[in-house]
């Protein structure tokens, strides 16, 4: 048994999660700002009442887990392509090219050819073989961190672990990680509905810079032709003749982006949630066989991805409510992972709970996350090393808060020190 494995975060979340305010909203015109700051409480109120809400920008937020699973693979829907960008008035440029040419925002044969070259490299067997290398990365990070007292956990551990891992997988120079992570965290804002028009110039500039970096990496790999993932991938897709040069760039750009940003956020929140309950933290220190369960529950409780987009190809009836043909949908993972039908007392962070067989946070069907296994291993090994090397870790100042409700979410920084003596 895990001692005191559950925490009533519906009360305790005042430390570091979004505190509920009044939910007096129009369910057919919900402000994005309210969803970003009060998402959990809004979803908890409306999920029993109706299967979806409509956001102020016209996008429908699907709230219930069963409907999210259904619509993730339902032939009456498809993955969005450039619709969200066009909806925001973006019709060209580096960000538009990223959306237009990446496997994430494609369907059918186009999606298949863009994904196929990466699928083998991210198979469970291939990725599981990386576990020792990932564990080594965590140890090296703590060799340096144990020399300091107070430090920014988000920047110095949670960010570094996935960046160094993806650099290792792709054969990128480790010294490049500060450069590309800086760009990744700016570009990834385009995968959230919360970016403001005045922010787009910076997002676009960062996308241009990241695209140029990936292009140079591909050129360097072509000159050296080493026996690494990147060289093998480029050789395979070029022999198959399935991808254009811009598609090569965008698939690798997506891997760098997806492999860095979401794991960073998850590492911060899993650690914070475990630290919030000293008895749970002590149990994890004493029996690390519970680490995987803590990671799964952390990904449920505060998923780093708030929703997945789809497009309705026909009118779709959900429990008497109709999603109109042509509607842009956001399948709210954030809501579905707290659906009372599937989770008893979903507002509790409970490491001992039974999870659904397929974790909703990684998507569904042919678009299910390629990096699912890699993310889990990074989080598990990151937490294991943390428990062993920093057993007296303590948060200094404010606990981190999760921000956002759709696409990629963000966690505020977490400052820590290696002692409970504050």
Curated annotation (Swiss-Prot):
Induction: Transcriptionally activated in the presence of wounded plant tissue and by plant phenolic compounds, such as acetosyringone.
Top-rank taxon: Bacteria
Gene Ontology MF term list: heme binding; iron ion binding; monooxygenase activity; oxidoreductase activity, acting on paired donors, with incorporation or reduction of molecular oxygen
Keyword Metal-binding: yes
InterPro entries, alphabetized: Cyt_P450 (IPR001128), Cyt_P450_B (IPR002397), Cyt_P450_CS (IPR017972), Cyt_P450_sf (IPR036396)
Cofactor(s) in the UniProt record: heme
Function: Not essential for virulence, but may be involved in the detoxification of plant protective agents at the site of wounding.
Protein name from the UniProt record: Cytochrome P450-pinF1, plant-inducible
Natural source organism: Rhizobium radiobacter
């Amino acid at each position: 048994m895990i001692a005191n494995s559950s925490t009533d975060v519906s009360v305790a979340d005042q430390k570091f999660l979004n505190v509920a305010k009044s939910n007096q909203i129009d369910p057919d015109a919900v402000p994005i700002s309210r969803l970003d700051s009060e998402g959990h409480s809004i979803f908890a109120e409306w999920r029993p009442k109706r299967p979806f809400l409509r956001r102020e920008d016209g996008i429908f937020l699907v709230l219930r887990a069963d409907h999210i699973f259904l619509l993730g693979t339902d032939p009456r829907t498809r993955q969005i392509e450039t619709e969200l960008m066009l909806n925001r008035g973006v019709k060209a440029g580096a960000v538009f090219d990223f959306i237009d040419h990446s496997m994430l925002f494609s369907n059918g044969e186009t999606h298949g050819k863009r994904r196929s070259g990466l699928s083998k490299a991210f198979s469970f067997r291939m990725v599981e073989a990386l576990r020792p290398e990932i564990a080594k990365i965590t140890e090296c990070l703590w060799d340096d961190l144990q020399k300091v007292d107070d430090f920014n956990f988000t920047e110095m551990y949670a960010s570094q672990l996935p960046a160094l891992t993806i650099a290792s997988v792709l054969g990128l120079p480790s010294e490049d990680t500060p450069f590309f992570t800086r760009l990744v965290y700016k570009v990834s804002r385009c995968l959230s509905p919360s970016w403001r028009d005045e922010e787009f110039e910076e997002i676009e500039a960062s996308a241009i810079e990241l695209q140029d970096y990936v292009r140079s990496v591909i050129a360097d790999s072509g000159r050296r032709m080493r026996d690494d993932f990147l060289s093998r991938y480029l050789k395979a897709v070029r022999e198959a003749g399935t991808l254009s040069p811009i598609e090569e760039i965008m698939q690798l750009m997506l891997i760098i982006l997806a492999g860095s940003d979401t794991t960073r956020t998850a590492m911060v929140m899993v650690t914070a949630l475990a630290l919030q309950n000293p008895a749970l933290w002590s149990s994890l220190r004493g029996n690390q066989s519970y680490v995987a369960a803590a990671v799964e529950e952390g990904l449920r409780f505060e998923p780093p991805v708030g929703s997945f987009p789809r497009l309705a190809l026909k009118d779709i009836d959900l429990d008497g409510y109709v999603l109109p043909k042509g509607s842009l949908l956001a399948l709210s993972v954030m809501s579905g992972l707290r659906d009372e039908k599937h989770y008893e007392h979903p507002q509790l962070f409970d490491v001992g709970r039974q999870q659904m067989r397929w974790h909703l946070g990684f998507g569904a069907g042919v678009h299910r996350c390629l990096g699912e296994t890699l993310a889990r291993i990074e989080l598990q090994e990151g937490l294991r090393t943390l428990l062993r090397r920093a057993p007296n870790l303590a948060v200094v100042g404010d606990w981190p808060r999760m921000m956002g409700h759709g696409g990629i979410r963000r966690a505020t920084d977490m400052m820590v020190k290696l002692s409970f003596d504050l």
